[in-house]
């Protein structure tokens, strides 16, 4: 499985201000650009993985957030592909040019990965927010070169992950990717390396999630899929 580090997130000291506004910030490209200009949302200059912990009922689970090729979502629910809401969501994501939250995937984690993420969690968290349901979401940035290399090596050895999210959301992401790819091909600029060919994913150990995995809050970790 190929999973790369990535940048894009709210300003650390303004996350509690940003999250309640995500409905407006992610309502359109102009609103998002305004939030970036205001310093509410950041585009990190460097690339990093993120350790993500969700704690509450029924327990605690830790995943790693990374960029994966969009084809990891291939084979999502065919019925969802015909869903009118999913098609509308795909168009909205393509117009916004940003993936609003990571898609949740389940993968075969290794004990070494547990050690790496455990070490990352010993430091101060980048974010720690509790939602109205009482679920606490914590995020740690992993950007030390040796840690990034170790995580990348572990993920390179892992089998392809399985979808552990709403099939309609996965379909919307693949649909947005296809719409933007079609536009690039029509313009004669398609290379295959564009950011819309990748998706930001929260990868959770399959042994810790049954069926649906936790969802990272909308706007907490996003992915710009095309130029504004």
Where are each of the predicted segments found?
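Surface-exposed, charge/polar-rich loops and edge strands
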Residues: 1-161, 166-228
């Amino acid at each position: 499985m190929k999973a790369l580090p990535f940048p894009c997130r709210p300003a650390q000291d303004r996350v509690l201000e940003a999250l309640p506004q995500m409905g407006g910030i992610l309502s359109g490209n102009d609103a998002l650009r305004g939030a970036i200009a205001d310093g509410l949302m950041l585009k990190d200059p460097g690339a990093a993985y993120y350790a993500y912990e969700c704690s509450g009922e029924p327990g605690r689970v830790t995943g790693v957030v990374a960029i994966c090729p969009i084809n990891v979502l291939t084979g999502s629910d065919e019925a969802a592909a015909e869903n009118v809401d999913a098609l509308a969501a795909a168009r909205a994501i393509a117009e916004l040019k940003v993936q609003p939250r990571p898609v949740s995937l389940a993968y075969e984690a290794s004990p070494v990965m547990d050690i790496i993420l455990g070490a990352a969690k010993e430091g101060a968290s980048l974010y720690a927010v509790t939602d109205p349901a009482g679920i606490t979401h914590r995020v740690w940035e992993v950007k030390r070169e040796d840690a990034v290399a170790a995580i990348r090596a572990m993920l390179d050895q892992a089998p392809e992950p399985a979808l552990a999210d709403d099939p309609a959301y996965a379909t919307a992401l693949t649909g947005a990717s296809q719409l933007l790819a079609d536009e690039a091909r029509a313009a004669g600029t398609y290379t295959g390396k564009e950011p819309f060919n990748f998706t930001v994913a929260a990868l959770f150990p399959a042994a810790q999630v049954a069926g649906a995995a936790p969802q990272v809050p909308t706007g907490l970790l996003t992915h710009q899929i095309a130029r504004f």
